[in-house]
């Protein structure tokens, strides 16, 4: 069975996907307000609350997350105090074997189940800038998330989006008008031994993708508005978002 998905649909004013929003500990950009407004449930992972607090000065009561989770080594004391006073759920997750992002997803999935929400995707803001080790930790969380939630997860920061394709066939609709010029398929963790695509300028036909051999970066679209990908192992899809 093919999995059909429009990665940039949450950014569209007319988008119909039902999503939850996770704010990580990195600067927020202009897309934040639109995504916040339409989210079914909103959460901050530890220091993500600092960025939310700073960005919404003068209107903070309109931007209260359902919960803030983490080991609370990054959230500033005044930020923690503010959201506590406003009735937000502050959930301590001290486990050092997992990142605050991973632990936030665990809490989020429990909330989704408790509220019996129908969720199409989890949109995450941040996680793709700054320190390289933290970027790779974000990618690792996408792999871990398959054991946490059945809901697909996208990570967005500035002009980049990543989404982990599971083994099988995928139809990615790239006709929203918000797509930038580049895209890529990156075999993180292990080689993908059979990858076939359509809709790209440089397509693959039963090709092996792997570090040390071939990695499909700086690819682009053929103009059809649809990309299909078939892979035998998890494969990271990345794409540009128009500024």
Curated annotation (Swiss-Prot):
In terms of SUPFAM superfamilies, this protein maps to: Thiamin pyrophosphokinase, catalytic domain, Thiamin pyrophosphokinase, substrate-binding domain
Q: What is its EC number?
A: 2.7.6.-
Q: What is the tissue specificity?
A: Detected in kidney and liver, and at lower levels in heart, brain and testis.
Show the stretches that span the lipid bilayer: none
Q: What GO terms fall under cellular component here?
A: cytosol
CDD domains per record:
TPK
Pathway this chain belongs to: Cofactor biosynthesis; thiamine diphosphate biosynthesis; thiamine diphosphate from thiamine: step 1/1
Entry keyword annotation includes Nucleotide-binding: yes
Per the record, the domain of life is Eukaryota
Q: Which Pfam families match?
A: TPK_B1_binding, TPK_catalytic
- Extract the GO molecular function terms from the UniProt entry: ATP binding; identical protein binding; kinase activity; thiamine binding; thiamine diphosphokinase activity; UTP thiamine diphosphokinase activity
Entry keywords, A to Z = ATP-binding, Kinase, Nucleotide-binding, Transferase
What does the subunit section of this Swiss-Prot or TrEMBL entry state? Homodimer.
* Family classification: Belongs to the thiamine pyrophosphokinase family.
- Check the record and name the NCBIfam families matching this protein: thi_PPkinase (TIGR01378)
Fetch the PANTHER family from UniProt.
THIAMIN PYROPHOSPHOKINASE, THIAMIN PYROPHOSPHOKINASE 1
Q: What is this protein called?
A: Thiamine pyrophosphokinase 1
